Amino acid sequence: IVGGQEATPHTWVHQVALFI
């Protein structure tokens, strides 16, 4: 996860959505 925030479900889902 890019950033200093906690790896919340919504955060990693958003990251994966941007990654694919």
UniProtKB/Swiss-Prot annotation:
Catalytic activity as recorded in UniProt: Hydrolysis of proteins, with broad specificity for peptide bonds. Native collagen is cleaved about 75% of the length of the molecule from the N-terminus. Low activity on small molecule substrates of both trypsin and chymotrypsin
One record GO biological process: proteolysis
Keywords on record: Collagen degradation, Hydrolase, Protease, Serine protease
Domain Peptidase S1: 1-20
An MF annotation (GO) of this entry: serine-type peptidase activity
E.C. numbers: 3.4.21.32
UniProt keyword Protease present: yes
Family: Belongs to the peptidase S1 family.
Function: This enzyme is a serine protease capable of degrading the native triple helix of collagen.
Name this polypeptide is given: Collagenolytic protease 25 kDa II/III
Organism annotation: Chionoecetes opilio (Atlantic snow crab)
